[in-house]
C-alpha cells in the first residue's frame, strides 16, 4: 500500500463560549439586516461567568433590542441556569455599540451614495476558498466528521436521548489519508476524541457508552472504523463546569472550525457579526463558491482559491488558483475561467450571493457547525456555478 499520513480537524459545539459569542454576533447581524439590508455591522461579543457583552460599530435604521437578542440566543442554546454555565435570564448583559467610523463610511460606500459595483472593500485582507472531492459536500472528511459529531452531540442533548449532556463540548477526528497525485483519499478514521460537558448524575463509563452508541455510530460511516480506531471519550475524567463559567468566550476565535478544519489556508479574518461589505466574510464566501465549482465541474479534484483586497477599492488586487496538480487543464487557464465566471467586487458579491438578506436566523445558522459544506438554501455560496470548459482534454 502507498504511504499514508494522518490529518486532524477539530470542532466545538454551539455551547462552547467562543461559539456562543459567534452566534450572538450573527443574531445581531440577522436582526439588523432583516429590517435594514444596508446595515453596516461589526458586532463583537465576549462572555465570562454570569456576563455577556456586545460591542462594536453598527450603523442601521433597524430598531434592535440587543439585550433580548443576547438572552434569546443564550436560552436557545441551552444556557438556562448557572449550573450549566450561564443563566440566560439573569446574567448581566452589557452593550457598547457606536456608529461606523465616518472615515470608513466615506471610503467604502460614500455614506451610502455609491452604486453596488462601486462599493469598495470594507478593509484590506486576503481570503481563501477550498474544495476537495473526498466527500459529497466537497469538504475535507476530517473536518466534516468533527463538525457532524458536534452537531449530533447537540441533537441528542436537545431531544433528550442523552439527558446528562450539557451545552459545552469539543470534538476532534484524525483521519488516515493517501495522497493520490495531489488528491486526498481518506482510508480510515484513526482517532475520535470527544470532550463533552455533563451533569453530576452520570459515570464516565455511561458517558463513553452513550457517546459511542448515540453520537459516533450515527455519524461516522462504518467503512471508516476498524478494530484499530482509537477513542478518547472525555479523557480528562470530569467536565461538569463549562460554558462561560469554565472559559471566557470571544467572537472570531474559531476561524478554522468555521472553514476547512486546517486544510487549505486561512487569511485570518473571522466571519461572525460582519455585514457583507466586510470582505473577511463575503470574500471568503465567493472563493468557496469558486473552489467548489471548480471541483464540481470536473476541472480539478482539489483546489484552493485566494482573493485579496484594499480598503475602499472595489476590484480585487489579486486572484490565485492552485489545484495541487489535480487540474485537468493548467492552473493559469482555470484562473482565467474563474475570473470570467465570478465577480469579486464586494457590492456584486452581496447581490450575487444575496448576502444582504437577514432574518430566518440566516447568519446565526452559519455561526455553529461551519459556514461551508452545508445543505441549506440560505447558504447561497454553496450553490455550484456551472463553469464552461472544454473537457475533451480528459481523454
UniProtKB/Swiss-Prot annotation:
Cofactor: how bound: Binds 2 divalent ions per subunit. The metal ions interact primarily with the substrate. Can utilize magnesium, manganese or cobalt (in vitro).
The UniProt record lists the keyword Phosphoprotein: no
GO CC annotation terms, alphabetical: cytosol
InterPro entries (alphabetical): ADOMET_SYNTHASE_CS, S-AdoMet_synt_C, S-AdoMet_synt_central, S-AdoMet_synt_N, S-AdoMet_synthetase, S-AdoMet_synthetase_sfam
Cofactors required: Mn(2+); Mg(2+); Co(2+); K(+)
Pfam families on file: S-AdoMet_synt_C, S-AdoMet_synt_M, S-AdoMet_synt_N
Keywords on record: ATP-binding, Cobalt, Cytoplasm, Magnesium, Metal-binding, Nucleotide-binding, One-carbon metabolism, Potassium, Transferase
Protein name: S-adenosylmethionine synthase 5
This protein's encoding gene: METK5
